[in-house]
């Protein structure tokens, strides 16, 4: 089954017929050059698809990166002046169709003869992810969410209504426009906003897309059994294998190269990228292009303008939109044609797009018993620890923290544990530290975290000073892609009329998929390469669980904490339920409803 895309000569597909097929070499590819702006996951994926499926010579592919390291938001470093730094983590699942299509071909750096996908698959089979404590309250006590969503019937109906709403009816609407306290006061909303970092003022459209995209994982939402994680941080587990693959293919990495604009010749609806303006180590220069040169640009960035603190300094600094960087580049491109999107919709209000994370590294054994009491696992076992975030339900910062398999860094001291902490509310005073998170040093953030672990108050300061080191990172635009939007605010991957230019990443438009995922980056890269180069192979469509009645039935029962949707009070319509159900007696519909626990004894 195939469905035509709005991308030149490309289409979506599903099933393994095309998944296992190799496309022929596109005509004329040896005469082309590709310039990729940025070296984050989307950019590296585009380069990999050019090599693997486009069969472009590696020496014809040029990656232009402003920094001196690849990876973009997929970072993970040891800074000798600060400590270990992870700005975020990557939650993945089995139906990231484009991501796994790519990583089946990227050799593992850890297991000889295996792919990154092989390594990841074996790891998560042998050490499956699940949480034993999803949330705490009263300073480290289990909040006993117990896998329940605690939604009222009215709350369930609000979610159902959003689920059924057309995209265009949600343009520029916020979550607050479609939900009320029936949802916001539920455990469902605690799970949802802490796991995905949604705020009440974010896009109702994106909320709906998330719900539809991951409907098959509703049952795994309370305990994170739906999730899978890499062995190490995302830089070492995902970025480095891709970089090695590309270097082996002869791809050129040009670091310290800041692209400031792409100049277009636009005539009669035809858009041709003619030049790239850039600075190489601060010196202005340019690249002249022909129609045979392909340009791929990652527009916007969730980690642009990150401000770093350390143990004794808060991440203070200018968090305004920079005159340089990804946002400025997109703005310069967007000025040339409306088809290139509206970056100001996403980067103009950092009070609504920021949050702060911190990496806490333990230095001895003193904090570990408090961690182990909550997660009920040995943090230094090398296996799953928290199994996803633990949210401090009554935290003023809405603090959450997680410990993935240790060490999170390949060269990490085996006696140390790296903890990732983040707070959704950065501008309100804490519960132990009486000032906003954004004004806190690393030590003070550790103190607030220790308070919510249940450490005795008279020990907190000493442990934060001597038993841990913390690196806070303030990210002004981390949820910029969640801001309310309308059609055209995000440009198409290949904007209408573009001959040799495509956008990549989280701020492009592609149907049905959801931002803030590794899959979105890789999907847009695949669509861009296949569309511009004419790769004759289908792009895997977004997993179609939203169209699978079995998944819809299962998720409905789960969302209602085990009650059947048929048990809902429909008022005057209650009297017709039994007669209508009698019509399906003895049919495959009855069997389907019984198999998925919707139809129960006594209902017919």
Question: Language-model features: where?
Answer:
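Short, small-residue-biased leader/transition segments that mark boundaries at the very start
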Residues: 2-7
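Beta1/beta-strand and adjacent pyrophosphate-binding region of the FAD-binding site
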Residues: 26-42, 62
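Glycine-rich FAD pyrophosphate-binding loop
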Residues: 51-78
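Conserved FAD-binding subdomain of flavin-dependent enzymes
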Residues: 81-122
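Rossmann-like flavin
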Residues: 109-216, 228-229
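Helical element adjacent to the flavin cofactor pocket in flavoenzyme catalytic cores
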Residues: 212-294, 299-300, 312, 318-327
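C-terminal segments that line or cap access tunnels to active or ligand-binding sites in enzymes
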Residues: 215-230, 292-294, 299-524, 530-544
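Active-site-proximal substrate-binding core of FAD-dependent oxidoreductases
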Residues: 531-590
């Amino acid at each position: 089954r195939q469905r035509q895309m709005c991308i030149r000569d490309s289409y979506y597909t599903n099933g393994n017929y095309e998944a296992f097929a190799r496309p022929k070499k596109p005509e004329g590819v040896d005469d082309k050059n590709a310039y990729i702006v940025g070296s984050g996951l989307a950019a590296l994926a585009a380069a990999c698809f050019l090599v693997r499926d486009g069969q472009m010579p590696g020496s014809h592919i040029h990656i232009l990166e402003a920094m001196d390291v690849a990876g973009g938001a997929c970072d993970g470093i040891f800074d000798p002046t600060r400590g270990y730094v992870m700005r975020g983590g990557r939650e993945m699942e089995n139906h990231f169709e484009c991501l796994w299509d790519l990583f089946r071909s990227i050799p593992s750096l850890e297991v000889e003869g295996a792919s990154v996908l092989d390594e990841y698959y074996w790891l998560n089979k042998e050490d499956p992810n699940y949480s034993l404590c999803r949330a705490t309250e009263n300073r480290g006590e289990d909040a006993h969410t117990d896998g329940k969503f605690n939604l009222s019937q009215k709350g369930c109906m609000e979610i159902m209504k959003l689920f059924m709403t057309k995209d265009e009816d949600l343009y520029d609407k916020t979550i607050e426009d479609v939900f009320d306290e029936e949802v916001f006061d539920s455990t469902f909303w605690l799970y949802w906003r802490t796991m995905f970092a949604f705020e009440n003022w974010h896009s109702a459209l994106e909320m709906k897309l998330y719900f539809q995209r991951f409907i098959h994982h509703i049952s795994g939402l309370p305990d994170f059994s739906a999730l899978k994680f890499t062995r190490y941080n995302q830089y070492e587990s995902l970025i480095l294998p891709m970089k090695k693959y590309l270097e082996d293919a002869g791809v050129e990495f040009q670091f310290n190269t800041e692209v400031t604009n792409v100049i277009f010749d636009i005539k009669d609806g035809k858009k041709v990228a003619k030049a790239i303006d850039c600075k190489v180590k601060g010196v202005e220069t340019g690249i002249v292009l022909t129609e045979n040169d392909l340009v791929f640009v990652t527009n916007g960035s969730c980690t642009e303008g990150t401000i770093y603190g350390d143990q004794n300094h808060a991440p203070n600094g200018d968090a305004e939109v920079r005159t340089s960087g990804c946002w400025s580049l997109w703005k310069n491109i967007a000025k040339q044609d409306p088809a290139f999107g509206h970056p100001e919709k996403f980067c103009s209000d950092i009070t609504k797009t920021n949050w702060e994370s911190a990496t806490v590294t333990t230095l001895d054994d003193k904090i570990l018993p408090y961690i182990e009491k909550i997660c009920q696992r040995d943090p230094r076992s090398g296996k799953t620890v928290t199994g996803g975030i633990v949210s401090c339900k009554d935290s003023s910062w809405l603090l959450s923290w997680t410990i993935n398999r240790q060490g999170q860094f390949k060269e990490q001291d085996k006696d140390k544990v790296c903890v990732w902490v983040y707070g959704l509310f950065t501008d309100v005073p804490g519960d132990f530290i009486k000032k906003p998170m954004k004004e806190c040093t690393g030590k003070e953030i550790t103190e607030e975290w220790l308070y919510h672990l249940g450490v005795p108050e008279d020990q907190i300061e000493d442990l934060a000073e001597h038993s841990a080191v913390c690196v806070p990172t303030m990210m002004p635009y981390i949820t910029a892609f969640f801001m309310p939007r309308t059609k055209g605010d995000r440009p198409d991957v290949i904007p209408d009329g573009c001959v040799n230019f495509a956008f990549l990443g989280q701020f492009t438009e592609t149907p049905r998929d959801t931002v803030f995922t590794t899959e979105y980056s890789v999907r847009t890269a695949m669509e861009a390469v296949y569309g511009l180069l004419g790769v004759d192979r289908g792009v895997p469509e977004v997993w179609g669980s939203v169209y699978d009645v079995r998944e819809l039935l299962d998720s409905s029962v789960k969302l209602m904490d085990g009650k059947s949707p048929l048990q809902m009070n429909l008022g005057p319509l209650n009297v017709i339920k039994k007669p209508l159900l009698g019509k399906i007696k003895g049919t495959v519909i009855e069997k389907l409803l019984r198999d998925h626990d919707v139809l129960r004894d006594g209902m017919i």
